[in-house]
């Protein structure tokens, strides 16, 4: 039963995020907000809502290990599995903006997270630093997008009442789904004798990263594999700056020695994909398989440690 509740929680998270994005994007279009800005803000933040709900809920419930390990695990999964799988399906050329900007920012925020948790706590001040970084990151994206701006296409929008219904139901599903996911994950951890860190790094982080994986696989099958790298790295940056920033600002998050070690692994993975990206212009199938194998090895390690 508890496993079904975990699945239910994750389904609610994904559907809630989907409804919230659709409703919010329609409101933004009615207000004549350019689609490029909608994509860089509402949609980008919307794809991180499952992780946000789980981490914020876990922090408020005192499940600090899940709050941090969920984000670290999601970022490692995004980097190695989401990008790796896309490369295996369809090799793709590297985007210069991602290589020269996003991958470097990804490394920087990963290092910053590791430094912040070294004292065993991610406090409110450090959370606010992340949130300031988030604002700067989004402003930089918007400025960059405006340089390459294209004409907005006519897109059908929802009615005012539908927008409100979508947003309200979406938020309700996200909150309820986050609560169910954290509660059931803790019960599963207790039943199987697993730590909160292990359940956060595996089941919860993979579950909340499924939207990114599904989106990237669909993009790869349509010959748009290059989008997966931007989506994965952008999601990683949002996860740290937005989710851990908001979570620790609301309620300081304690970090265990395992959490601290896993942030070092995240730095290593961030450097790995940067090195792979720098070495040649194409993300080949061999590189994709290598990245997936690295993730499998990491999974084996955290289960037996």
Regions found by a protein language model. Give the residues of each.
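Hydrophobic alpha-helical segments, chiefly the membrane-spanning helices
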Residues: 1-305
């Amino acid at each position: 039963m508890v496993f079904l509740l975990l699945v239910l929680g994750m389904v609610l998270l994904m559907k809630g995020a989907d409804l919230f994005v659709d409703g919010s994007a329609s409101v933004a279009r009615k207000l004549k907000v350019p689609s490029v800005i909608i994509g860089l803000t509402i949609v980008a933040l919307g794809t991180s809502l499952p992780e946000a709900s789980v981490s914020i809920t876990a922090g408020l419930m005192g499940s600090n290990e899940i709050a941090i390990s969920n984000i670290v695990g999601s970022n490692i999964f995004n980097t190695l599995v989401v990008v790796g799988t896309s490369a295996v399906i369809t090799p793709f050329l590297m985007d210069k903006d991602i290589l020269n900007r996003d991958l470097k920012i990804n490394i920087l925020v990963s290092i910053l997270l590791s430094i912040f948790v070294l004292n065993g706590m991610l406090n409110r001040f450090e959370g606010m630093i992340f949130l300031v970084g988030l604002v700067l990151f989004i402003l930089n994206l918007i400025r960059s997008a405006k340089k390459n701006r294209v004409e907005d296409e006519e897109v059908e929008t929802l009615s005012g009442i539908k927008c409100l219904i979508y947003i309200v139901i979406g938020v309700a599903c996200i909150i309820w789904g986050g609560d169910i996911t954290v509660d059931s994950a803790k019960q599963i951890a207790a039943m199987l004798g697993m730590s909160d860190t292990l359940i956060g790094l595996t089941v919860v982080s993979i579950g909340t990263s499924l939207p990114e994986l599904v989106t990237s696989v669909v993009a790869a099958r349509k010959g748009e594999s290059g989008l997966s790298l931007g989506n994965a790295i952008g999601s990683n940056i949002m996860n740290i700056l937005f989710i851990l920033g908001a979570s620790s600002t609301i309620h300081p998050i304690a970090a265990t020695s395992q959490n601290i070690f896993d942030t070092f692994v995240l730095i290593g993975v961030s450097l790995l994909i940067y090195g792979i990206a720098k070495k040649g212009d194409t993300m080949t199938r061999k590189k994709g398989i290598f990245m997936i194998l690295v993730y499998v090895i990491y999974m084996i390690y955290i289960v037996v440690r």
